[in-house]
Amino acid sequence: MLTLRTKTTSPLSFLRLDAGLFAGNSINRETDSRKDFIGRLGAEKAIGDWGKWGAGFSYYHGFVYNPTTEAYEMRGNHFVKRDMGETGTYMKRQYLGLDGQFSFLSSLGKTTLRAEGLIGTQPGIAGRSKSPNYSTRPENLPENSLFKRPFLGYFFYLVQDIGASPFSAVLKYDVYDPNTKVSGNEVGAENSFTSKTDLAQSTIGIGGI
């Protein structure tokens, strides 16, 4: 991985660029020689002695192995089957991300606000929007065919320290839409090849750490 920063005396010292080419995901062994690109341009700066802000833009570009001779892509509000002609083709996986955070000190303790959003394309399978994590090459079976979905996800965090105590209250709201091309009654429509896997979901969480 390559990291670029200016000298601390530079007016641009609050910027940082990280980028690299990676093989595999460090979970299962790599099954091909393709590399994925991951990059992030971030900024972080203090506001006096009472606060700090940060923001970033990230980009991911990679590929997912398709073990079958078929694949599915969205056309309008339904999937269309494609004949790939052979096994061992690849589908593009691409993410664009934005993140930001702001923290400040007050009589209540430290308050941190954080938000992050991702959009892109995610090849999954019929019953799961997450990309397959193969440790070995799977068989040429229909259930292993890739489904390419345009997705959107974002979350908001509020973390409030409780005075000088070691405890914090946390409020979180997150949304994940695995397929932005369909919604409501369109999901599961006849001959659309969509299913509950394509349903959007959102959650609100309250807790402490």
PLM regions with names:
Residues 51-61, 66-209:
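Outer-membrane beta-barrel pore domains
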